[in-house]
From Swiss-Prot:
This is Ubiquilin-like protein. Residues 129-138 have a biased composition (Polar residues). PANTHER family: UBIQUILIN (PTHR10677), UBIQUILIN-LIKE PROTEIN (PTHR10677:SF9). GO terms for cellular component: cytosol. Residues 113-138, 305-325 are annotated as: Disordered. SMART domains: UBQ. Disulfide bonds: none annotated. GO terms for biological process: ubiquitin-dependent protein catabolic process. It comes from Homo sapiens (Human). InterPro entries: Ubiquilin (IPR015496), Ubiquitin-like_dom (IPR000626), Ubiquitin-like_domsf (IPR029071).
Length: 475
């Protein structure tokens, strides 16, 4: 059987309630709950395991209203119908705030609180031990803003958002701009007690004791927090700054470092990008041969590069073993004409800290022997002379420059150099031009003019004969 004892809202001259409930005959299984409304408060004796819905049904007989009009608030949180009082931590002597919504549903809770009486000078708060305690408010503070503060701190937007206009940002802005709320937030003593007695705050302080020392014991930090809560424009600005910083890792439309310094971790991300670029530049300068990302730009400077297949088996097994053991070998053919071709069998990546050396070898191709320079890493031993056969020409036929064309060019260049060196007349002519630069310049001028070059060609035998006579006289 539930017992209800009504308590009037009239206060004595001392500012305390006129009558207190003597609960000497209360059994241990029952709980005394104080229900506080806008005009009065009542004490109810309920069971420990009673649900919120059953408690609302009990309140309907006293307040003459419907079930959907009742809203119960405890410790800044709305009580749901399926919850029990013991689950929400409601114990003996705790205070539950009752809000009765209008039947039309047009008036918001903020508007209903504005019409509350303001003649009560003090407010009775909850106490876990069942004793009454008083929190004296400054002059001009009334009971209605205290109840409103409890309700504003609740999770009202999560439940019954279709009927509560408090979930709208406009209503929240009006509540924060209310002078009564501003005066309430400016009261440091009341806010300290309100925050410390909140259930979530108590759990937070139990898990993190440094929060109580940092926030509650430090009046300056608490004052800054309250100033931030009173300034709605500053809260909106912080939300706008935090919103893009959450998606900084995967931005939809990334801007080139736009406002990066104002975002958390912006300077760190900017410095990391600069550090990566500097590391790549330093690595390329200190290690120009291995892992250099800029070496690909020099690929166009190579005249002709031929990538060959594995080498054919030579006649001897010893040479075959040597070829398989030395995959990186470069052969450069040089002739008097200045022609060179570069052939690479397999360039390895581990040639960073190795220098290259040149060895000479004889290569015979159809009776023509030529001297070539073989470039290989220093850690590879020198290769013996390898005879290139006709099979090499078939393997390199798809290359940019074939060995057959290079052999013909080398042969022609060698024959031309032999003819030029064997001719005494040509040798004397070249010596004369070297000794007389002015004469060489005139000859170049004559070659550019057809008429002068024809006359020079006709007089050339006489000129050569005179030069031979002068050489004999000088000898």
């Amino acid at each position: 059987m539930w017992h209800a004892i009504s308590r009037t809202s009239r206060m004595s001259q001392s500012g305390c309630p006129s009558g207190l409930l003597a609960d000497k005959n209360i059994s241990s299984s029952a709980t005394r709950v104080i229900v506080k409304t806008a005009g009065n408060q009542k004490d109810f004796m309920v069971a420990d395991d009673i649900s919120v819905r059953q408690f609302k049904e009990m309140l309907l007989a006293h307040f003459q209203c419907q079930m959907d009009q009742l809203v119960l608030v405890f410790m800044g949180c709305l009580l749901k119908d399926h919850d029990t009082l013991s689950q929400r931590g409601i114990m003996d002597g705790h205070t539950i705030y009752l809000v009765i919504k209008s039947k039309q549903g047009s008036r918001s809770l903020a508007h209903s609180f504005r019409d509350l009486p303001t003649n009560d000078p003090c407010h009775r708060d909850r106490n876990t031990k069942g004793n009454s305690s008083r929190v004296h408010q400054p002059t001009g503070m009334n009971q209605a803003p205290v109840e409103l503060a409890h309700f504003v701190g609740s999770d009202a937007p999560k439940v019954h958002t279709q009927n509560l206009e408090v979930s709208h940002p406009e209503c929240k802005a009006q509540m924060l701009e209310n002078p009564s709320i501003q005066r309430l937030l400016s009261n440091m003593e009341f806010m300290w007690q309100f925050i410390s007695e909140h259930l979530d705050t108590q759990q937070l302080m139990q898990q993190n004791p440094e929060v109580s020392r940092l926030l509650l014991d430090n009046s300056e930090i608490l004052l800054q927090t309250l100033e931030l809560a009173r300034n709605l424009a500053m809260i909106q600005e912080i939300m706008q700054i935090q919103q893009p910083s959450q998606n900084l890792e995967y931005p939809l439309n990334p801007q080139p470092y736009l406002g990066l310094e104002t975002m958390p971790g912006g300077n760190n991300a900017l410095g990391q990008n600069y550090a990566d670029i500097n590391d790549q530049m330093l690595n390329s300068m200190q290690d120009p041969f291995g892992g250099n990302p800029f070496t690909a730009l020099l690929a166009g400077q190579v005249l002709e590069q031929v990538q060959s297949s594995p080498p054919p088996p030579p006649p001897s097994q010893e040479q075959q073993d040597q070829l398989t053991q030395h995959p990186a070998t470069r052969v450069i053919y040089n002739s008097s004409g200045g022609f060179s071709s570069n052939t690479s069998a397999n360039d390895t990546l581990n040639k960073v800290n190795h220098t290259s050396k040149a060895n000479t070898a004889m290569i015979s191709t159809k009776g023509q022997s030529h001297i070539c320079a073989t470039r290989q890493p220093a850690w590879i031993p020198a290769l013996p002379s390898i005879e290139l056969t006709q099979q090499l020409q078939e393997e390199y036929k798809d290359a940019t420059v074939s060995l057959s064309s290079s052999r013909q060019t080398l042969k022609g260049d060698l024959q031309l150099s032999d003819e030029q060196s064997s001719s005494q007349i040509t040798g004397g002519m070249m010596q004369l031009l070297m000794n007389n630069p002015y004469l060489a310049a005139q000859i170049m001028l004559f070659t550019s003019m057809p008429q002068l070059s024809e006359q020079w060609r006709q007089q050339l035998p006489t000129f050569l004969q005179q030069t031979q006579i002068s050489d004999l006289l000088s000898a």
